[in-house]
Amino acid sequence: MTNIRKTHPLLKIINDSLVDLPVPSSVSSWWNFGSLLAACLAVQILTGLFLAMHYTSDTATAFNSVTHICRDVNYGWILRYLHANGASMFFICLYIHVGRGLYYGSYMYSETWNIGIILLFAVMATAFMGYVLPWGQMSFWGATVITNLLSAIPYIGTDLVQWIWGGFSVDKATLTRFFAFHFLLPFIIAALVVVHLLFLHETGSSNPTGIPSDPDMVPFHPYHTIKDILGILTMLTVLSMLVLFSPDLLGDPDNYIPANPLNTPPHIKPEWYFLFAYAILRSIPNKLGGVLALVLSILILAIIPMLHTSKQRTMMFRPLSQCLFWLLAADLLTLTWIGGQPVEHPYIIIGQAASVLYFTIILLLMPLVSTMENHLLKW
């Protein structure tokens, strides 16, 4: 008798995606981050749902409602900090996931890669809007500064900003619509994740060697289910330690001050996971140029498949490209550090140098070094 999981219309889909799915036997723990991201999304949707039951999106009561959640709601404090620090874990996993894609040439599956870029933008938009909701000082001024960047768009910029604000400044209308979008977007992200997986399962997963792995596959269950569960438990342990021992480690103290439109904080900065892009934005003196650099710093991922000049798919056997990859990782960490510093000497020049290096590595050095490695293969 055939097993029901192989015949039932609904169970068959789950079976083909999570049980009998053939996976290359050589995939390493770097392939775990997809499942970790799914776990992060589940944690964020669940905690967010319970937080939304108590939160009020009104400028007069938003800050107090968050305080009420932490003080009066049963386990409200843990929900709030799981949600806030869950976002940090989400971005750590997200950046490692993208980095793994760059290192092992996963971008050659263009549909999966492009959906992934859309997902990255959607998660960034969701996180930005979520940061505005507690209505602290950094929430308010972060929202004001970042939305104001759209005014750099010629002709329609000012109208666009006022349209997003729902008035002439960040106010009640802005907060209400940001809450609505922040609630809606995670479900759109979940739908995009399904599409992401759909395209991935069309081609099958890549592997560290970059060579076709059809002759050497293992079933997803039990090998990779066990591996994923271990990864998820590790991530949840780290998240729990962060939430229970130092919940405000990654936050901004200014956000414990209620939003005041009449008092600007000395250093306006976004959450740590946007600091690299913020540093690139600040490194260009021109407003429109800065906004373009900011968008291109993420959108540049879309042209990476076109910049692939190597005869090998992955960097596993390409030591020169590996050096460049880790230089890029170090450069991004430098940009993250600079983004959190005040705009003064020597941080300005370091930020500008790191920004130039970021684009130079991706657009110029990586394709050149890949071509050079192709010639070295002939020796």
From Swiss-Prot:
Taxonomic path: Eukaryota, Metazoa, Chordata, Craniata, Vertebrata
InterPro entries: Cyt_b/b6_C, Cyt_b/b6_C_sf, Cyt_b/b6_N, Cytb/b6-like_sf, Cytochrome_b, Cytochrome_b_C_euk/bac, Cytochrome_b_N_euk/bac, Di-haem_cyt_TM
A single cellular component GO annotation: respiratory chain complex III
PROSITE patterns (UniProt xref): CYTB_CTER, CYTB_NTER
Further remark: Heme 1 (or BL or b562) is low-potential and absorbs at about 562 nm, and heme 2 (or BH or b566) is high-potential and absorbs at about 566 nm.
Subunit structure: The cytochrome bc1 complex contains 11 subunits: 3 respiratory subunits (MT-CYB, CYC1 and UQCRFS1), 2 core proteins (UQCRC1 and UQCRC2) and 6 low-molecular weight proteins (UQCRH/QCR6, UQCRB/QCR7, UQCRQ/QCR8, UQCR10/QCR9, UQCR11/QCR10 and a cleavage product of UQCRFS1). This cytochrome bc1 complex then forms a dimer.
Positions annotated to bind heme b b562: H83, H182
Pfam families listed in its UniProt record: Cytochrom_B_C, Cytochrome_B
Protein name: Cytochrome b
Chief location bin: mitochondrion
